[in-house]
């Protein structure tokens, strides 16, 4: 709760600092805008919704155990997948959700303030240089980096996935040859590509170079298609040919 309150309070301070420039440009006295009250209310609501999930994952991680047996793919103790990994995933997902919420909050605060106090509208040039745009872009970059992080963590799920169904109905779980060779490194590279392409697209968007924005963003689906084709070809040519002998 304390962390949420502090984060909301600081975010609102930056919002008020950005709005102050519009009031100064319009030669208006800036009214007293809500901060402490709205920070308290938002923090209470978010804490009530998310506290149970975080407490459960935290207690699971703190009370975890090590089995002394490492998986052959990542050389990590089996206990990590049962106790620490769910906690790490929960933290990243929580962070993404929080950044999305704050992005909506920032946009809503500005829009409501603009509609209430600036009947004549605002200068687009001032808006582009304002803290508002910087806050939104910063949050988007943080969300992108968090998505990359969760992608890297989720790659480890190949160890627990189903990879073979036997004729007697029994399913075997673990990592197949494609999983440990192509998928692991393919998705690790994909996480890096997401970050680089998204950040470069944002930079070019700020420069209004929209052709490069499309170029950088199109790299992501192109890479996914290429990865799918590599997996398909590898499966047809190498795995299906004689998987048991490999």
List the model feature ranges, each with a label:
Residues 1-76, 85, 89-246:
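Contiguous transmembrane helix-bundle modules in multi-pass membrane proteins
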């Amino acid at each position: 709760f304390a962390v949420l309150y502090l984060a909301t309070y600081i975010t609102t301070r930056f919002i008020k600092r950005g709005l102050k420039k519009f009031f100064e440009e319009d030669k208006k006295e800036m009214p007293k805008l809500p901060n402490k009250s709205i920070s308290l209310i938002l923090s209470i609501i978010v804490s009530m919704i998310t506290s149970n999930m975080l407490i459960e994952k935290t207690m699971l991680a703190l009370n975890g155990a090590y089995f002394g047996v490492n998986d052959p793919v990542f050389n990590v103790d089996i206990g990590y997948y049962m106790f620490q990994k769910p906690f790490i995933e929960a933290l990243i997902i929580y962070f993404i959700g929080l950044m999305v919420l704050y992005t909506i909050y920032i946009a809503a605060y500005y829009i409501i303030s603009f509609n209430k106090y600036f009947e004549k509208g605002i200068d687009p040039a001032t808006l582009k240089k304002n803290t508002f745009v910087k806050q939104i872009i910063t949050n988007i970059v943080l969300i992108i980096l968090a998505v990359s992080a969760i992608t890297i963590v989720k790659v480890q799920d190949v160890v627990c996935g189903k990879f073979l169904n036997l004729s007697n109905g029994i399913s075997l779980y673990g990592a197949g040859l494609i999983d440990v060779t192509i998928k692991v490194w393919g998705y690790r590279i994909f996480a890096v590509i997401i970050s680089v392409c998204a950040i470069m697209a944002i930079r070019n968007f700020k420069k209004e170079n929209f052709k490069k924005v499309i170029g950088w963003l199109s790299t992501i689906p192109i890479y996914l298609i290429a990865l799918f084709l590599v997996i398909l070809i590898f499966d047809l040519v190498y795995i299906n040919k004689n998987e048991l002998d490999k």
